[in-house]
């Protein structure tokens, strides 16, 4: 059974924070070679604080995917380290949240749910459902070209607000991720092409997907 739910930084058990930060080092340092700070095998930064909410995707209490949310009224990566990469951009603030540190732990996902799991799409849907449940207007994020392509293929309604170049001289995109009915339904339809799940269970928050493991 796959469960997706949200937890605030202040309410996160220490062992779960360690688990997230360890998985983030594997993803963002070891696999993607981002310029991130890692200490004792864990990746975290100044944006992991009381203003942060995490979506966790767990199978048998093991984290297999996660994403970080911060309300745009607080300091974010978009208004902080990413700001120099984009020019002449007017950001929507009121009612918007930033997403960052999106990951699916590929080895764990492959071992637990198989190669054709649509786990990324399920996490995309979780982001939409969470934002809708909390009354937000939309999600802002900065992504690489690879992630941009993955998002477009998912059927999610996304808008490019700006385009820049990272410190690695790679194209990056500042995106508005829609949380409209069509985005939700497109993501649900893609999941249903792979998994036999009652559609109504995918419209809720939190999300529980039974029978997804191998």
Curated annotation (Swiss-Prot):
- What are the entry keywords? Autoinducer synthesis, Quorum sensing, S-adenosyl-L-methionine, Transferase
The text of the family note is:
Belongs to the autoinducer synthase family.
Q: What does this gene product do?
A: Required for the synthesis of autoinducer molecules such as OHHL (N-(3-oxohexanoyl)-L-homoserine lactone), and HHL (N-hexanoyl-L-homoserine lactone).
One of the protein's GO biological processes: quorum sensing
Q: Which Pfam families match?
A: Autoind_synth
Q: What's the EC number here?
A: 2.3.1.184
As its record notes, the protein acts as a catalyst of:
a fatty acyl-[ACP] + S-adenosyl-L-methionine = an N-acyl-L-homoserine lactone + S-methyl-5'-thioadenosine + holo-[ACP] + H(+)
Origin superkingdom: Bacteria
- Annotated GO MF terms: N-acyl homoserine lactone synthase activity
Native organism: Yersinia enterocolitica
- Which Gene3D superfamilies does the entry link to? 3.40.630.30
The record's section on SUPFAM superfamilies has: Acyl-CoA N-acyltransferases (Nat)
Q: Report the InterPro entries cross-referenced here.
A: Acyl_CoA_acyltransferase, Autoind_synth_CS, Autoind_synthase
Query: Which named protein is this?
Result: Acyl-homoserine-lactone synthase
Keyword S-adenosyl-L-methionine assigned: yes
């Amino acid at each position: 059974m796959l469960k997706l739910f949200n937890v605030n930084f202040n309410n996160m058990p220490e062992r779960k924070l360690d688990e997230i930060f360890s998985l983030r080092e594997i993803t963002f340092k070891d696999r993607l070679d981002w310029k991130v700070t890692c200490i004792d095998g864990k990746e975290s930064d100044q944006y992991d604080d009381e203003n942060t909410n995490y979506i966790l995707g767990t199978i048998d209490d093991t984290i297999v995917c996660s994403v970080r949310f911060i309300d745009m009224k607080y300091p974010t990566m978009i208004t902080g380290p990413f700001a120099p990469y984009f020019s002449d951009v007017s950001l929507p603030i009121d009612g918007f949240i930033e997403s960052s540190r999106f990951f699916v732990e590929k080895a764990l996902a492959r071992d637990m749910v198989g190669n054709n799991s649509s786990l990324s799409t399920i996490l995309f849907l979780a982001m939409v459902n969470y934002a809708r449940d909390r009354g937000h207007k939309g999600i802002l994020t900065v992504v690489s070209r690879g992630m941009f392509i993955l998002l477009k293929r998912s059927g999610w309604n996304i808008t490019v607000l700006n385009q820049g170049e990272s410190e690695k001289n790679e194209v990056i995109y500042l995106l508005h991720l829609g949380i409209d009915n069509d985005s939700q339904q497109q993501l649900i339809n893609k999941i249903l092409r792979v998994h036999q799940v009652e559609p109504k269970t995918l419209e809720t928050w939190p999300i529980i997907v039974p029978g997804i493991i191998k």
